């Protein structure tokens, strides 16, 4: 790679990969004077373009564009934040094969107003949330469901009704002793109930004929726990997180896209400042990273297009644990992008 820089102004990095590199070529422009940009061309002739503009005094912006002919994927999205009139916006369009997805989110920080619109091949949804003083109102208008929530920040009512399936849910909510309690009042082929709090174990359950979701969270147990199980129309997802301070941590996630049957899984386990293991299978890309407790070496291995590459980096005993990791990751990314096997 080639680097050009001018102190306190900009830094430009140009990379050229060989036949084994995942990145064929790329350019990175980091600047304190104008928007920063990243442009990459992958081995499969996919294109990735990203722009981050934190220079503008009025509106900060970040955009991402991905165009992959190999995977029939096109994505374009932009996140913007207005400083003068505090407002956050996110717009994205994704096309995978013949299926198109579109999302639009508008968030006004000053007036506590949120508008969300989602468009999918067989599903549309609009959600609007507003708050005036202590009064709260939310409306849902979708292909599958309609509903609303109305009340104050202390108590209110939630009503959800199916449009294509026969179900109806009515629940009351109230806030007391640091807990948001949701209790079912009327349930026909569905259920919404739970307790959300930072002080006691939390749980939330939503059930309809087409969607089932269960969440559990406990931050005060000796072993901190977060679990999420979701089974919907287009995908299912399972997440299991455990953290025992100073002893161990575990993050396990897996899911399936029901439209094409593809699976993904992520398994992270480790001991703080001593050991780490990552095993990720992201459909077409596999990554393994490990650093055993009884070893001073970190190993990186990835598999893509039936090509596997493994690298190993030794930790310096005189450097901090996380500094060693940052150094190893930097070296691996450099090798992953431009160097020969």
Swiss-Prot record:
Source superkingdom: Eukaryota
Keywords noted in UniProt: Allergen
Full protein name: Allergen Mag
Gene: MAG
